[in-house]
Amino acid sequence: MYLYNLTLQGITSINCAVHGSFTGNSKQQEVCVAKGSVLQLLFCDPKTGKISVICSCDTFGIIRSLLTFRLTGSSKDYIAVASDSGRIVILEYSSQKHSFERVHQETYGKSGCRRVVPGQYLAVDPKGRALLIGAIERQKLVYILNRDAQANLTISSPLEAHKNYSICFSIVGIDVGFENPTFACLEIDYEDCDHDPTGDAYKHIKQTLTFYELDLGLNHVVRKYAEPLTEQGNLLIGVPGGSDGPSGVIVCCENYLVYKNLGDQPDVRCPIPRRRNDLDESERPIMIVCAATHKTKSMYFFLVQSEQGDVFKVTLEADGDLVTEMRIKYFDTLPVANALCILKTGFLFTASEFGNHQLFQIAHLGDNDDEPEFSSRIPLDEGETFFYDTRGLQNLILVDQIDSLNPMITSHIGDLANEDAPQIYALCGRGPRSTMRVLRNGLEVAEMAVSELPGNPTAVWTVKKNVDDSFHAHIIVSFTNATLVLSIGETVEEVTDSGFLGTTPTLGCALIGDDSLLQVYPSGIRHIRADRRINEWRAPPKRPIQKCTMNRRQVVISLTGAEIVYFELDMNNQLREYSERRELTSEVLCMSMSEVPEGELRSRFLTVGLADKTVRIISLDTSDCLAPLSMQALPAEPESLMVMETSSEQTGTTSIMHLNIGLQNGCLLRATLDQVTGDLSDNRTRYLGTRPVKLFRVLIQRREALFACSSRAWLFYNYQGRFHLTPLSYSALEHAASFSSEQCSEGIVAISENTLRILALEKLGVLFNQVVHKLKYTPRRLVVHPASQNMIIIETDHAAFTEKGKRRRREEMANDLIEMAKDQEEKALAEEMAHSLRNYEPDESIYGSARAQAGKWASAVRLLVPKTGQTLCQYELPEGEAAFCVELVNFRSQNDSTFVLVGCAIELELRPKRSKGGCVYTFLLTNNGMRFEFIHRTPTPHEVYAVHDFRGMALIGVGNLLRMYDFGKKKLLAKCENRVGYIFINILSFLIQKLLQICVNYKEGGKV
């Protein structure tokens, strides 16, 4: 048997997202996202602002598009999914099963992502009467949606709306009320181009806006109207119709937004504003990449995002059914998104194209600020536009985000932080938002509070005052000779009138009955009633209590000499001792029993761990109380026990009981406990750490979970129908308990040395937590220096400015402004604007970088400490040089030195591919790998894509040449070369030190 693959972390990029009321709650909206083959339902909590995953389902295919729709009169939205399966699938979310249910599945074409097979585009009539699924080329199918007699969704056979020689760019449903459903398509007819051998027809090709109408009476789709467009468009936005708006579409074209509609409506055309002081070429068009519509009973507006990330608010002014004006206003700047979703709860969810996906709270709608609003009525000459100044977030507040590694360029696995467990170092992102992320296996922990204590505590518990309370009332902290009681409120404060005995250590405490508290200490048991009356049970002289366990109705203690004493709460809320006691053959090390099952009076079993490396199951049933039932031998002495009932995935009821055993050798042993006979079976073992394992019961998502403390803290919990045993990315903890308050509804209180910590676990189900370090350009490759464990990263961006290039470009623009001034007044104004332009340095990680001409490159070599993210040294290459490979080389002529070789291309153009050669930069690592120094630059006749250390020399792929270089004082010295055909050498690696593997690329393929 061989391991094929194991997915440690699923796809993090989101290619499409829709929102709606999928759970049937009209006051709540969810977001449905497609992550490659995975369909997820996300809930954005309006109280906490956190994103949680309600449901996750693998479709085992590529999801091409998503759509949400609702039948008239319904309160629940459906999800239409188009994938590479050649089928249209309609899903409904089941709140009872917590999963998606397939309502319909219709096959319409071949499998695969083909240009002529529908699935790339989905559109629906706003009234939910018809659905259109379209291909990139030629084919479109329309399905009629209806209800049967039982009010179930039905779908008709597909109606064809094909058009030969047409390429589709966007499709949207038009809001026409209850008239025949109409769809708008952005198309190009290439028939003339296809039959023109000269290529002249391509230069005069026109894009058309085509309206397709579904005649419900004739059951037929017709092309109702087609209109050629002046500018090339890429996106259609549907405008609310009927009583909500004027209907029609907004066509997002190059540099313009154009409103169009059928009938007598004239076009309303508004330029897309540009950034002031932008370094981009003014001739470069601006395009809208995504949009979102928000509609209420009294108003509607659109948020559109440009390819630079700037978000604009667009509104329409109408006179009756005719739109007279379009207004556009700068809203905020966000990372470029694949989809925007505006929720009723006031959130904006952005599925970012690159980097983390973000959730924003819409604080303002931008109506009452000083930002200028531009109108289609403002007269402008052709080609002129409006200008605005970018700024920080003003209308949006970031409240949460979902980590995304997209795109991950390369990675390295190693324990560079000396943590006894390897980390994954991933180079991610693009441009100025690029990052180096350190991934560690473990749940991310949020510290809510950390307080120092007067000594080193031994244990901690939380208790409620009443069984119906939502939050805990006290934190009980035990020391070796005292007990500290803290009250939980807006702040955590010490109290002295709680009824707990503070002059002795506490062995255990809990809420017993409905409103009483119980404290077990070495000399006895203290029963604290709600009316402050206290009953005490004293331990026999010279036989103090060693161990204890309890639930809401039962208490079991172990006295010195391995004697077990059992107590149970009677109907009068009195704690009664059982008449008999049980002496065991070995010292009691730990004990546990489960919570009282629902509908029963007591837990049936007591589990006891003994010093003879056994665990005993003892009955607590009234017929054979304290009678031994079964025994299990252990590989080491037990440190702690925890009996927990877990839910069955099929029925959702608590039906399986497990005994978790923490051993002193650092292992966790889990066995199934038979609820009838008490037998143990199905043993499973997991190594957790070097310290003895202590187990505690906590609540995660209102369900019992197991918290284990060893040299590292672990959490064993149920999430979305699966059990997860995951370490915490946090320092070692010694004792823990569940914690709940108004400020932290579900957390954990723990002790570590002399501190009390309140922790929250927010990102459940995530295998890795991330530490992010920012980079300047898109990272390409990395190498690790073995001695210092430092990392050398090369970063390269195409069509980007270097720092010198930016300063030169600003100076050119400033001089142009001054030269354009005609009189003294204009010259003074131009001088002021030029000064502002020269000092304009926006944060590119927020606003993105300006785009230079094709063939311009910006590159840098960075020496970074991976543990802290500190940049020790950075070298920026000249403009036009693109770094593509990096390697550490030890030349045999320089035995005691390690060199960094960086291979580059000079003024490389991608289409068509051409360059002015390449070069190799040589750097010397100094100060034990803490610095590097530039030595020399070696020009090459072709681009350099691969460098490798080979037998004390540098083996370099120079275009289609394989060259061997030795170290020289002024440049590298070429020793020999070999031509490898008409190919480019991309990767050099070694197999068994002597066998050389060369990976090369043809123009249209690859070969090894």
Regions found by a protein language model. Give the residues of each.
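Large eukaryotic, non-enzymatic subunits of multiprotein complexes that serve as scaffolds/tethers
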Residues: M1-V1008
